[in-house]
């Protein structure tokens, strides 16, 4: 028998908590035996004194086990259960292509995703732009679509990791969100509750990233890779660039359109292609679906080129309640804004740098993102044809096209876009799309 206040005191004094103490405290979070004040106090103690790797693994697994842990054995799946998670960015539409691509190569992808908050877009919000798509299906339907189609992208159910829901809301109100240990446990507890065989983790770097510096992003990536592998899930973390919008657009329905264009081959943004292939190839390798990276990439290109990945996306949409002809006729179903108009820079030169966070906030201002949880979204608004760093910009070249519902909203977004994209006489140095892979062998 432990006392919550003694566990808090121990961590406050910089000592190491045992797995049993952590399990006791997490159980108290779930059952309300531990008060909000005590949760806040432990969060602050961890923020200042951190946790070692054993503590992080114990916290992650205790939170994972605080609710339902999905079990796929009864479905007799004939392939590995694999997934991807991103720390979030702007124009990050990867999940919509990666899930069907991995499924087309023999994997099963039960992807639990979130909604957008702040400047980052949420995968679930993109699917909410599709009429009829159920982002919160019954567990029976979720399992059926995973088995029959190979991929289902849905929201977190109430019985999955309840400890994280309570802990996170308190961290958000007590300035302890930025702890690497607590971020690691929050992300991984939800992913590991899906009983994955393998996970590819996309940790963003740059002006649109969650973490403020490359060093902080790398520290988080290493922590996630170490804890996930320590908890028994094969995991690789990739450090990927978010110094510019990842796709050529940002906004929910607009990103769905770009995802379908990617899957069908109508248009594949080269940066989006590079990061999607890097993450998806790693999933195939970790899941034993490819012998090496070249084999993985060949398989992925094949399912893109023969239409299998696009077909699976369509089956997932219809399986979860969306239109059966969505891939073929998406323009019939996706909402469109009243005003669609280009923005031009005031100077000529090269797109030199981008405040990606500000571009994400411009989408929020248009109505495409949330200022606070529960806000209603306008799925039609956002930005398209966003220039890439290094693009030559002149008086006839738009730096973006704004999709807005009013002249006032357009004017606000236009001002934000012009301020966020810096034009210079000198072209910037090219940065890689993927900075590093952190595999189990690198830890």
Swiss-Prot record:
Secretion signal, residue range per the UniProt entry: none
GO biological process: pyrimidine nucleobase metabolic process; thymidine metabolic process
Disulfide bonds: none
A single GO molecular function term of this UniProt record: thymidine phosphorylase activity
Residue stretches spanning the membrane: none
Reaction catalyzed: thymidine + phosphate = 2-deoxy-alpha-D-ribose 1-phosphate + thymine
The keyword Membrane appears for this protein: no
Domain of life: Bacteria
Pathway membership: Pyrimidine metabolism; dTMP biosynthesis via salvage pathway; dTMP from thymine: step 1/2
Keywords tagged on the record: Glycosyltransferase, Transferase
SUPFAM superfamilies named in the record: Nucleoside phosphorylase/phosphoribosyltransferase catalytic domain, Nucleoside phosphorylase/phosphoribosyltransferase N-terminal domain, Pyrimidine nucleoside phosphorylase C-terminal domain
Matching InterPro entries: Glycosyl_Trfase_fam3, Glycosyl_Trfase_fam3_N_dom, Glycosyl_Trfase_fam3_N_dom_sf, Nuc_phospho_transferase, PYNP-like_C_sf, PYNP_C, Pyrmidine_PPas_bac/euk, Pyrmidine_PPase_CS
EC number annotated for this UniProt entry: 2.4.2.4
An example Gene Ontology CC term for this record: cytosol
Keyword Mitochondrion: no
Alphabetized PANTHER family for the sequence: THYMIDINE PHOSPHORYLASE (PTHR10515:SF0)
Entry's family note: Belongs to the thymidine/pyrimidine-nucleoside phosphorylase family.
Assembly behavior: Homodimer.
General function of this protein: The enzymes which catalyze the reversible phosphorolysis of pyrimidine nucleosides are involved in the degradation of these compounds and in their utilization as carbon and energy sources, or in the rescue of pyrimidine bases for nucleotide synthesis.
Record-linked NCBIfam families: PRK05820.1, T_phosphoryl, Y_phosphoryl
Protein name: Thymidine phosphorylase
Species of the source: Shewanella oneidensis (strain ATCC 700550 / JCM 31522 / CIP 106686 / LMG 19005 / NCIMB 14063 / MR-1)
Annotated gene: deoA
């Amino acid at each position: 028998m432990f006392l919550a206040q003694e566990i808090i005191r121990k961590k406050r004094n910089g000592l190491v908590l045992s797995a049993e103490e952590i399990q006791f405290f997490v159980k108290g979070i779930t059952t309300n035996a531990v008060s909000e004040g005590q949760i806040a106090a432990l969060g602050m103690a961890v923020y200042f004194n951190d946790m070692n790797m054993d503590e992080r693994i114990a916290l992650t697994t205790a939170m994972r086990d605080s609710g339902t842990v999905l079990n796929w054995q009864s479905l007799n799946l004939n392939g590995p259960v694999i997934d991807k998670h991103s720390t979030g960015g702007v124009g990050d539409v990867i999940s919509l292509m990666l899930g069907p691509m991995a499924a087309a190569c023999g994997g099963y992808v039960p992807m639990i995703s979130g909604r957008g908050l702040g400047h980052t877009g949420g995968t679930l919000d993109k699917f909410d732009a599709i009429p009829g798509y159920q982002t919160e299906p019954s567990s029976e339907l979720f399992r059926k679509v995973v088995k029959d189609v190979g991929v289902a992208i849905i929201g977190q159910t109430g019985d999955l990791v309840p400890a994280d829901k309570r802990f996170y809301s308190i961290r958000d109100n007590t300035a302890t969100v930025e702890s690497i240990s607590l971020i690691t446990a929050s992300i991984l507890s939800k992913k590991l509750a899906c009983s994955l065989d393998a996970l590819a983790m996309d940790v963003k770097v740059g002006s649109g990233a969650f973490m403020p510096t490359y060093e902080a992003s790398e520290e988080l990536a290493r922590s996630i890779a170490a804890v996930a592998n320590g908890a028994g899930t094969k995991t690789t973390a990739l450090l990927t660039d978010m110094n510019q919008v990842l796709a050529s657009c940002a906004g929910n329905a607009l990103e769905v359109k770009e995802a379908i264009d990617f899957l069908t081959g109508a248009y594949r943004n080269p940066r989006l292609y590079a990061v999607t292939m890097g993450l998806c190839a790693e999933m195939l390798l970790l899941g034993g679906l490819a012998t090496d990276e070249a084999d993985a990439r060949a398989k992925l290109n094949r399912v893109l080129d023969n239409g299998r990945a696009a077909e699976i996306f369509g089956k997932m949409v219809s399986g979860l309640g969306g239109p059966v002809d969505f891939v073929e006729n998406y323009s019939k179903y996706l909402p469109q804004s009243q005003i669609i108009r280009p923005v031009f820079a005031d100077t000529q030169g090269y797109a030199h740098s981008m405040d990606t966070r500000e571009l994400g906030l411009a989408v929020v201002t248009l109505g495409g993102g949330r200022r606070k949880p529960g806000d209603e979204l306008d799925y039609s608004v956002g930005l398209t044809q966003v220039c890439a760093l290094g693009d030559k910009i002149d008086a006839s070249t738009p730096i973006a096209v704004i999709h807005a519902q009013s002249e006032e909203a357009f004017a606000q977004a236009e001002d934000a876009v012009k301020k966020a994209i810096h034009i210079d006489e000198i072209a910037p140095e090219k940065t890689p799309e993927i900075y590093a892979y952190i595999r189990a062998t690198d830890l």
